[in-house]
Amino acid sequence: LPAFGTGSNLDLKTERKAVSLGGEKWITPNLMFEATFKNEDKDGARIFGKGFTCPSGVAPTPICTALAAGANQWALLLLPEPINSTTRQFEAKLNYIGDKFAVTAGYYGSFYNNDNGSLNPMVVGNLNNPLGHPMGADGSVPLTAGLRNILQLPMALPPDNQAHQFYLSGNYAFTPTTRANFKLSYTHATQHDNFAGNGFTDGPAGVNDYGGVLNTTLAQIGLTSRPMPKLSLIANLRYEDRKDESPLALYNIEGANRFTNGTYSLKKTAGKLEGTYQLPANLRGTLGIDYEALDRGQLSSPECIDLGDGNCQGDSVAGISGLRAKTHETSYRAELRRAMSEMFSGAISYVHAERDGSSWLKPNALPATGVTPVSDEAIFNRTAIFPFIFMDRKRDKVKLSADWSPIDRLSLQFTGEDGKDKYSAPTTKGLRDTKMRLYGVDMSYALSEAWKLTAYYTYSEQTLHVSHSTGYIADLEDRNSTAGIGFSGKPMERIDVGADLLYISDRNIYAQTADQLASATNVAFLAQSGGLPDVTFRDLRLKLFGKYALQKNSDIRVDLVHDRQRLNEWTWGFNGVPFLYSDNTTVGLNPNQNVTFVGVRYIYRWQ
């Protein structure tokens, strides 16, 4: 086992080469054709890895050698993912624009090809245990054949796939004050990359590829109307049906238990209704209601394979205590806006939302698959684990805003927001609540008819309070300050120039405490270590552009971007000690990153 720091350096990087082409043509005064094509090649490598503990539920004895209680072996390897892929995107559409009716019909295609199908690691020699000592030293158990063999199993890389979408969208003006819009689309996505061609020869019998099929249908309709001079109405309805029609096969095994791959279908319905009325005293009031329903019906009635012996095997849910097939959320909004004078106006808004769902589904233990519907009382456990996307949630948010123009050339906007989410489930653990605050100011100043100056500043705080099932409480907080200043103008009739300077300061705080049921060892360790340090990020970015009009229908544009970033993140190392993998490989990230981008574009518009 070589000592860390004695090997060669490898700089992980990815190069992207992209070419895009687009054009448009007016066939008639009302009909236009548009087409775009983009080809992007990626080459290089990025950070990736593999880890395993042995024995475990998915690899019991005799696959993994049985060890004494609490003496499981585990290892973590750095395995850079080789990248050599091509993504092609093509879109073509017809646009018709009439006096009252406008419609667009189009096709969009995406084609992904990966020249690397699998990653095949090799473990040469010994590995370190979790304490950084060679396995087998100091009386510990040597590296077992079971763990070595599992670490050397091939790993699948992103497979070839493609998607085809046909869509139709448009709008129609019934009257000068009433307009409707709509969109219909159908997407057919497939994945048929061959297993054997990618180095996988021990798949299910008779199955040559995954045969993935995902069909998505989307329908949306909206209406805006002003039935009265003082009343405006908005209504929207959106429906999306995503059907995962991939075939099932017995891909997975835990000991002697077999189960299939999992498919995930989703139906999503969303609606919005809003009304705005002009009140006396320069007041304008808005009331709105939003509704969203998610139907994951396949979770409550999962597909399965009839094995011919009376058993029907499906996929297995593990690692969580329960899930839900359906959730629905209703939001209520109210806003009051007033123009105090020609120079100043302000608004206050409030949002309240509640989300709940169907009964909880408890995963069945192997060899059974699927889930069983149960009540909250039946599934309750003090340390139960429920994904937050299924948990009940109450949301309250208030927002203040103001617009002020003390002089014609100067405009200022002020914003302040405060919100809180509360989560609940049949457990005392998990995500409890989140909070957010945001304050911002934007400024725009016209130096002259040809020159404009802009500036802004935003400060935000986001917090998450999580009670972990293992006995600690995490109060996670992110503080972010963003400031920018820029200008744009025309020094000459044919020339446009501009510049923007952006500064970002971000700090993630990981405050940790032990709860009353934490072990004495964990309490002592937290007190000694002090918990996790903060993570900080700084970004200073300068953007410059210039555009020259060669002719009425052609331009040339030059962009220059210089970006300087600094990241202080303990994941990559702490106090000068880099992160160490089980084979003594170290990984590091240069905390100071400087990037310069230069782009030149030629723009031609067909008349």
Please place each PLM-identified region on the residue numbering.
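Solvent-exposed loop segments that connect transmembrane elements
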Residues: L1-F4, R46-L78, N116-A156, Q191-Y210, ...
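Transmembrane beta-barrel wall of Gram-negative outer-membrane proteins
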Residues: A3-D43, I47, I63, L77-Y112, ...
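Residues that define the transmembrane beta-barrel architecture of outer-membrane proteins
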Residues: E15-V19, T86-F90, I97, D160-F166, ...
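Membrane-embedded beta-strand positions in outer-membrane beta-barrel channels/transporters
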Residues: S20, P80, E91-K93, A102, ...
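Residue-level signature of outer-membrane beta-barrel architecture
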Residues: K25, Y96-G98, Y172-F174, S225-R226, ...
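Repeated loop/turn-to-beta-strand initiation elements of outer-membrane beta-barrel proteins
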Residues: N30-F33, K100-A105, P176-F182, P229-A235, ...
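Transmembrane beta-strands of outer-membrane beta-barrel pores
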Residues: N39-D43, G98-A102, G109-N113, Y186-T190, ...
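Outer-membrane beta-barrel "beta-signal"
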Residues: N590-Q607
